[in-house]
Design a protein with these regions (language model features):
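Membrane-integrated ABC transporters
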Residues: 1-157
Length: 157
């Protein structure tokens, strides 16, 4: 009997980016929400200043710290992805971030804020994965809460 199969998986919400340069922020919103800090992209965009060119890994680590998420950047091979604590963030295509939600010896599933959920074989993922991952875990200062900016339809009229 596999005891890990009895462990409840965290549900990771899919959050799509609305601008090309906010994939990193969208990934942080997904991971934070999976850990119980239910937030959205608009709230994080207002709370954390971002460059028009997007976020670097270092900037994502700073924001994660401010949100109460312990983080560590790792360099690893594709075959080592199943060893990561998920959900975590992967550096993708040299200029993009995705959230890894599942990995085994044959395939991975990522939430790509540009296109949605994707399941890829390791061979298919190989040209995209840069070898850098960011593991994130709640600290004692992490707050489980809902923090979403309401959208007011009156601004459209």
């Amino acid at each position: 009997m596999n005891l890990l199969s009895l462990w409840p998986r965290r549900r990771v919400p899919m959050i799509l980016q609305s601008e090309a340069a906010e994939c990193g922020l969208a990934c942080l919103a997904m991971v934070a929400s999976a850990h119980g800090h239910d937030t959205d992209l608009l709230t994080l965009r207002r709370r954390f200043e971002m460059s028009s060119r997007g976020a670097t890994l270092g900037r994502l680590m700073q924001i994660a710290d401010q949100m109460g998420l312990a983080n560590r950047a790792l360099r690893l091979e594709l075959e080592e992805l199943p060893q990561l604590q998920v959900p975590c963030i992967l550096h993708w295509d040299l200029n993009h971030f995705v959230v890894l939600v599942r990995a085994d010896a044959k395939r991975i599933t990522v939430l790509d804020p540009a296109v949605g959920e994707r399941t890829l074989t390791l061979k298919e993922a190989s040209p995209h994965f840069t070898g850098v991952a960011l593991e994130l875990a709640p600290t004692q200062t992490f707050e489980k809460k809902t923090e979403k900016t309401p959208f007011d339809l009156r601004v459209l009229f």
